[in-house]
Amino acid sequence: MSGLDDRKKLTHAKNRKPLNDIPKSAENRPNTRSTSSRRGAEKDVPITFIGSSRTVKADLPEFTNTRSRRPLHSESKKELSRNPVSRGEEHSSSLPKSSPESSVSVMSSNASLWSACTEEVNKIGVCAKRESRNLRVYKMKSFTSNMEQILSNDNQLAPTVIRILNSRNSWCLNSCHACLTFIMENITSDNYGKRSACLKALASITNSLLDTIIGFASTKTRRIGVDVVAEERAAKATECIHNFRKIVKNRDKIYKQIDQETIYKLDAILERLKKVSSHK
């Protein structure tokens, strides 16, 4: 058994390579180190930009990645207790300080506005008094038959009468005959109130009263006896038809003196007045 052991030792010694036979590639292989040790050994390389001077890292300001922290509620209370400022003082400090000159100018502007308002109120009061007077006169004299004479004596009463008749839609042959001349004259008026009232009156007359007027004008008187009322109605109706024909005849002249809105309203009225032009 000892002989066998000796033989195995000899064969093992023969197969064993000497230390000099280690390949050179292993010797020339670079000695590797850990990443952390290499990172520590590297030096800080300064960054150079084109057109700017070299700066060392120490010269640059240090920035931190930490976000700005909001102050706590307790800290804000402490700060308020240290510097107590009342709300009234803050409000007074924020308001601009007014100089005496600016206060004088504000007072003068307020006074001018107040005087303008007073003047307008006085004008409204004068108009209201005139309207109330016209209404009283109309109520006292509306049942009389001589309305033409009343309107001819008091020209300011005609607009009030026309507005009342428009609101009540109570136009008749007598009121049409009394107001039609005033309506024709004020269709082209610069006063918007008069112009609109006259247009509304003419539209109301042509809508509800035109056929009645044509009928009164075409009635024939009796051969035996005299009907005074029928003759008066026929005469008034004939005069109204004559005035209607004047409006149709002077259409182009009227159009040159009114605006577009009034032209649209007058077109509808003239369309209804075609019946008058065909009537003999």
Swiss-Prot record:
GO biological process: cell division; embryo development ending in birth or egg hatching; meiotic spindle disassembly; meiotic spindle organization; microtubule depolymerization
Subcellular location: Cytoplasm, Cytoskeleton, Spindle pole
Disordered: annotated span: 1-104
UniProt keyword tRNA-binding, yes or no: no
Keyword field: Cell cycle, Cell division, Cytoplasm, Cytoskeleton, Meiosis, Microtubule
Keyword Cytoplasm belongs to the record: yes
Residue spans of biased composition, Basic and acidic residues class: 72-92
Compositionally biased tracts (Low complexity): 93-104
Protein origin, superkingdom: Eukaryota
GO cellular component: condensed nuclear chromosome; cytoplasm; katanin complex; male pronucleus; microtubule; spindle pole
Function, as annotated: Forms a heterodimeric complex in conjunction with mei-1 which severs microtubules in vitro in an ATP-dependent manner. This activity may promote rapid reorganization of cellular microtubule arrays. May act to target mei-1 within the cell. Required specifically for meiotic spindle formation in the female germline.
Subunit structure: Interacts with mei-1.
Protein name (Swiss-Prot/TrEMBL): Meiotic spindle formation protein 2
Source species of the chain: Caenorhabditis elegans
Lineage: Eukaryota, Metazoa, Ecdysozoa, Nematoda, Chromadorea
